[in-house]
Amino acid sequence: RVVSVGADTWGVDYVLMSRKGELLGLPYAYRDARTQGEMERVFRKVPRARLFEQTGLQFLPFNTLFQLLAHQRQHPDVMATAHRLLFIPDFVHWALCGSEVAEFTIASTSQCLDAQQRTWAVGLLKKLGLPVKLLPEIVPPGTRLGRVRTSVAARIGLEGWEVVAPPAHDTASAVAAVPTADTGKLTWAYISSGTWSLMGVEVTRPVLTARALEVNITNEGGVDGTYRLLKNIMGLWLVQQCRKAFEARGRTFTYPELVQRAGEAAPLRSLVNPDDP
């Protein structure tokens, strides 16, 4: 019998809310170009190595840290008005039960978290001029957040259900579902394929070495106190964009048709590195 509900989503994106619980505008998608140049501005204040040593996250221009800096530079009035930042799954939980927390695995995608302390990197954020008052309490996956609001339950048929935070980052949930008993051991690896392909291993402490920085890998939160040491690899987004481009030209293909045509095409006629900036 199903008795609880929780949400997981992609990482890094967020909403800003007022003290009255109102959305201060719609959330930006992480592919929005507003973060251009933010990473370089940060490195002028905090060396790249120091930032990795504290946050353990690979450097991607859409990390929440760079999104927030862009938000503050472009819309300082909104940032000044904001009372709370909620990541997308945390916002769903708020809509369901009114909780204002950040589940650990989704918070770990932000580059605003101290990887070793598992708390917000307050000193770093203050140095960069970001308002730490926006940041909610961090809770581990499995935390009971409350009952579904009566008004919501009546509309969607969840009377009596409890909201429980899952690993709210979708990859963390996927890795948690791997059928192994060797939690946190280097006896297995995973590839989670979707818009992105995430390849990595599960470890018990973040890997913050110079070599990890050099190859730009990331330490994201997992379940049971683990970390997901992984690399972001461009995934099926390429196929999605190909299909979209074909449709714009009046040619509609299903995904199985695209796979079939790709298999029939002459191999290695072109070589594209989708991660080349």
Model-inferred region functions:
Residues 1-25, 53, 81, 137, ...:
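N-terminal glycine/serine-rich phosphate-binding loop of ATP-dependent small-molecule kinases
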Residues 5-10, 141-142, 193-196:
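Glycine-rich beta-strand-to-loop/alpha-helix junction loops that act as flexible
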Residues 13, 109, 189:
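Conserved beta-strand and immediately adjacent loop positions that scaffold enzyme active sites
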Residues 32:
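Carbohydrate-associated surface elements
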Residues 36, 43-56, 61, 66-101, ...:
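Active-site core segments that coordinate phosphate-bearing ligands/cofactors
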Residues 110-114, 135-137:
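Short, well-ordered beta-strand elements within core beta-sheets of diverse protein domains
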Residues 128-141:
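A conserved helix-loop-beta module that forms one wall/lid of the active-site cleft
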Residues 140-148, 168:
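Glycine-rich phosphate-binding loops at beta-strand->alpha-helix junctions
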